[in-house]
């Protein structure tokens, strides 16, 4: 019998634009945990570092709840990157004008599952 259990982790209001993190998330979706972490560690992006922390947290949650689980049995199932809070501020310009500055953040949701063969 094929057994699947899901474990999740969330990162809220992480200081990076969702537009920059989503392409990185597409690279690791559906991959084994060890391969996903290797991909994220080799990327120079700030978003890869943030995403790596959330993926490691989800794997830690899985290994905490199931002591017999090893890293080889964990696969990344779902990675969602959503908009977080936007911090708006004013940027003074020439001739008394002002531009609006928007600092974006993102929420990252990662779901990993264990893949193992169990009894009936």
From Swiss-Prot:
GO CC entries: cytosolic large ribosomal subunit
SUPFAM superfamilies: Ribosomal protein L22
Keyword Ribonucleoprotein appears in the UniProt entry: yes
Positions of the UniProt region annotated as Disordered: 1-25
Gene3D superfamilies associated with the record: Ribosomal protein L22/L17
InterPro entries: Ribosomal_uL22 (IPR001063), Ribosomal_uL22_bac/chlpt-type (IPR005727), Ribosomal_uL22_bac/org-type (IPR047867), Ribosomal_uL22_CS (IPR018260), Ribosomal_uL22_sf (IPR036394)
Domain of life, per lineage: Bacteria
GO biological-process terms attached to the record: translation
Short name of one Pfam family: Ribosomal_L22
Key words, A-Z: Ribonucleoprotein, Ribosomal protein, RNA-binding, rRNA-binding
CDD domains: Ribosomal_L22 (cd00336)
MF terms in GO: rRNA binding; structural constituent of ribosome
Quaternary state and interactors: Part of the 50S ribosomal subunit.
Family that this chain belongs to: Belongs to the universal ribosomal protein uL22 family.
NCBIfam families listed in its UniProt record: rplV_bact (TIGR01044)
Function in brief: This protein binds specifically to 23S rRNA; its binding is stimulated by other ribosomal proteins, e.g. L4, L17, and L20. It is important during the early stages of 50S assembly. It makes multiple contacts with different domains of the 23S rRNA in the assembled 50S subunit and ribosome. The globular domain of the protein is located near the polypeptide exit tunnel on the outside of the subunit, while an extended beta-hairpin is found that lines the wall of the exit tunnel in the center of the 70S ribosome.
HAMAP family recorded: Ribosomal_uL22_B
Protein name (database record): Large ribosomal subunit protein uL22
Gene behind this protein: rplV
